[in-house]
Amino acid sequence: MSGMEKLQNASWIYQQKLEDPFQKHLNSTEEYLAFLCGPRRSHFFLPVSVVYVPIFVVGVIGNVLVCLVILQHQAMKTPTNYYLFSLAVSDLLVLLLGMPLEVYEMWRNYPFLFGPVGCYFKTALFETVCFASILSITTVSVERYVAILHPFRAKLQSTRRRALRILGIVWGFSVLFSLPNTSIHGIKFHYFPNGSLVPGSATCTVIKPMWIYNFIIQVTSFLFYLLPMTVISVLYYLMALRLKKDKSLEADEGNANIQRPCRKSVNKMLFVLVLVFAICWAPFHIDRLFFSFVEEWSESLAAVFNLVHVVSGVFFYLSSAVNPIIYNLLSRRFQAAFQNVISSFHKQWHSQHDPQLPPAQRNIFLTECHFVELTEDIGPQFPCQSSMHNSHLPAALSSEQMSRTNYQSFHFNKT
């Protein structure tokens, strides 16, 4: 992706290896620019843009809903959900700032119009959100590991304040580790053989020796993908063994632990989240490592790189849009909270466009069922209490309490 210091028109790599005498056949500045930088507009602009539009819409709406659900509903403010909130913020930054910039650069690859500051910001943004995403995924996996294998320690240590401190460290480290790659980028200008500046040739690219860039990419791919994915895989394997052991003990003793189905549900959701994350980010890191390891480019290698480059971009942005869908499909609590937020917006819209509607018709009926843990929402049913609310989940429940809330929205005289 262009947002990931990659060039949208990788075909120029092979073109640059042509003999210098070819340059004398170039009859215009535009032809000379195309020779140096590749086509001004990517050949993939139209099909990729068509794919990006639904990803953008679904991703922005979904991640905004995730943020609203966690911010507005006290019952959703759990340590685990705070890490998911961090992931949603990271995804929103990618979709709102990164995707439009990449689409623009595919439409007009040069000149880069935002100057050195814009170049630094673009590089730092993508590096930071990449690192913050994988660190958030790793942190929530460690939290679940502690909750499953050391539940008493988790009850004492897993607090919202601690989660916020950890997230501060995560984002601080992400910004810090983005600096090396950012520092080697800048605006590059091209010149005619006589030394005069080629108009409109400014590009945001690597301006330091390529071996530095290659080294940074290889180190960060190991530290922020291969190593975390290995650690996460080991953690989920150990969690699976523990849950299997607990199930066997319960079968032997004839006791059913009501928390086990809930933990299994949450672990299933987080496991799917990690699996999708790993699959979607694999092409991105393959793309980066491909570019960093190849020293002698050929036409066939450039063609393969172009294909990998486009696929990696689609999967990268897809990972930012799919998380809210996973929450909605695998977590009844998130599903109910999403419906509650949407109903709240629907109620406000009705209030503005139909002010004569009686207030009683704009209430949301909430059925509260107290259960095991705020993020663990599948298990036996408990007696329920019904009450009338406007739009918020009950605020009296603490993160250590275990509750379950189902929501049903009613409009009594539907128009």
From Swiss-Prot:
Its main location: membrane. Pfam families: 7tm_1, NmU-R2_C_term. The chain crosses the membrane at residues 50-70, 83-103, 124-146, 166-186, 215-235, 266-286, 302-322. It is a multi-pass membrane protein. Residues 71-82, 147-165, 236-265, 323-415 are cytoplasmic. Predominantly expressed in the CNS, particularly in the medulla oblongata, pontine reticular formation, spinal cord, and thalamus. High level in testis whereas lower levels are present in a variety of peripheral tissues including the gastrointestinal tract, genitourinary tract, liver, pancreas, adrenal gland, thyroid gland, lung, trachea, spleen and thymus. InterPro entries: GPCR_Rhodpsn, GPCR_Rhodpsn_7TM, NeuromedU_rcpt, NeuromedU_rcpt_2, NMU-R2_C. Disulfide bonds join C119-C204. Gene3D superfamilies: Rhodopsin 7-helix transmembrane proteins. Glycans are attached at N9, N27, N194. One of its GO terms (biological process) is cell-cell signaling. One of its GO terms (cellular component) is membrane. Residues 1-49, 104-123, 187-214, 287-301 are extracellular. It is found in: Cell membrane. One of its GO terms (molecular function) is neuropeptide receptor activity. Keywords: Cell membrane, Disulfide bond, G-protein coupled receptor, Glycoprotein, Membrane, Receptor, Transducer, Transmembrane, Transmembrane helix. Belongs to the G-protein coupled receptor 1 family. Receptor for the neuromedin-U and neuromedin-S neuropeptides. This is Neuromedin-U receptor 2. It comes from Homo sapiens. The gene is NMUR2.
